A protein has these predicted regions:
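Conserved mixed alpha/beta catalytic, RNA-binding, or beta-rich assembly cores of soluble enzyme
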Residues: 8-9, 13-64, 73-419
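Short terminal hydrophobic/aromatic SLiMs and anchors at protein ends
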Residues: 2-6
Length: 419
């Protein structure tokens, strides 16, 4: 069964006359229902067969430029890419020495970080947890900017201990989860058998006042954090991407991202970001192309790169949107702004004359010449195709019970002139 998202190819602002068109639909995005994937399943074969079956049952013809995307969770599950808290703790002890370790700038997430924090605490004697404030890296707020203003606290200058933070702000409960993450993270550390000290700061170097051994837990700013700590005298400076880069006692692993992109599988295990995602994408593309006779692109996708306007949370908690994708998905869109053409360049035309003029303008566009900075492309921000398509896929498949971990996209690379 397939769910549809359809994007019209012709903007409403251009309908200034009556004329006929041979094609009325543009991009079509379908969420494909799939069987439950299990460890050991052939993710390439299962993905391709599921999509091919859906195409046959729904009388859909594959076309050149179609995209098959499968969520990273399915790939990792089929690989059996899991690790227990004990396995992670053993790696932490081996790489840090197991004494006092700073843990800097983690995101506030039960799914993403609670088991990682527990694992780190199991492997050391003391954790100095440095939380950024007023919010974490992806926008989960401990306190508001207004609260900082009222308390007279400068988050870029002031380093607070737990007592100072509580005196200024009291108990801080996340509006969506109802969790006081400060108390929650402290309890995780202590329940794992380690001593906990909580610090609030936005300069990562602040941790060096407590220890010279640090695990940087930020995601997208981790390289800068490690560079700053090393330059400031950090003796052992690691990131989450430096842990579980190889198997530990039979664990899963990721040589590129380590623990980045992992999330809670059960109370004792995390699922790691998948390995070999590039090879998986290439193999799915090859199988689909051979079966359909068309050039079908493929990608493995994780979190979308969008920001929630209500909660102010950037959803990208994975290190990248797409860890694997075929070569046809490399690059950025190079588009003309149809509204600009209709309202400005061809403002005196209507109907079929307008349609013809815009079509000729698009056909004359040189795909190899970037339109960045040209007025006709204003408003068509050239983001990476993998970020755009991966975000589209994440929104389509959802994160709950839709049962559509595979997404099939048609017409994404078409423009107004394509029949």
């Amino acid at each position: 069964m397939i769910y549809y998202i359809v994007a019209g190819i012709f903007p409403q602002t251009i309908f200034m006359g009556v004329f006929t068109m041979s094609r009325t639909l543009g991009t079509v995005v379908r969420g494909v229902r799939a069987p439950i994937f299990r460890e050991g399943d052939d993710v390439v074969a299962a993905t391709a067969e599921t999509v091919l079956t859906a195409l046959r049952e729904n009388d859909i013809a594959a076309r050149d430029g179609d995209v098959v995307a499968v969520t990273e969770s399915v790939v990792a599950r089929c690989q059996g890419n899991y690790a227990t808290c004990q396995q992670i703790a053993k790696d932490v002890t081996a790489k840090t020495g197991g004494e006092t370790v700073g843990v800097t700038f983690p995101i506030l997430s039960r799914n993403r970080f609670s088991l990682l924090l527990r694992s780190i605490a199991m492997g050391v004697k003391k954790v100095v947890l440095v939380l950024s404030y007023p919010a974490d890296e992806v926008g989960n707020h401990l306190v508001s900017l207004d609260q900082l203003d009222e308390a007279g606290i400068d988050p870029w200058h002031d380093v607070l201990n737990l007592e100072q933070f509580r005196a200024a702000f009291g108990e801080v409960v996340h509006p969506f989860t109802g969790v006081d993450y400060v108390a929650y993270y402290k309890s995780i550390i202590e329940d794992a058998g380690a001593e906990a000290e909580i610090v609030f700061a936005n300069r990562v170097q602040a941790v060096l006042d407590y220890t010279d051994t640090v695990i940087c837990c930020d995601i997208h700013t981790r390289k800068r954090s490690k560079r700053l700590l090393t330059a400031a005298g950090g003796r052992v400076v690691l990131g989450l991407d430096d842990l579980l880069t190889a198997p530990v006692d039979g664990s899963g692993y990721n040589p590129q991202y380590g623990l980045l992109g992992s999330n809670k599988a059960d109370e004792e295990r995390v699922k790691l970001f998948p390995r070999d995602a590039q090879e998986v994408a290439d193999a799915i593309s090859q199988r689909m192309s051979e079966a359909t006779g068309k050039r079908v692109e493929a990608m493995v996708y994780g979190d979308g790169a969008f920001k929630d306007p209500a909660g102010k949370i950037w959803e990208l908690a994975d290190p990248v949107v797409a860890p694997g994708y075929t070569s046809g998905l490399i690059g950025t869109p190079n588009e003309l702004k149809l509204k600009y053409l209709a309202d400005k360049e061809f403002a005196d035309l209507t109907g079929e004359a307008l349609q013809k003029a815009i079509s000729e303008k698009i056909k004359a566009k040189d795909a190899k010449v970037s339109l960045v900075g040209n007025m006709v492309s204003e408003g068509t921000t050239p983001r990476n195709l993998t970020d755009l398509i991966g975000s589209l896929c994440d929104l389509t498949s959802g994160s709950g019970d839709k049962g559509t971990p595979i997404v099939y996209i048609q017409g994404y690379f078409d423009n107004y002139t394509n029949e």
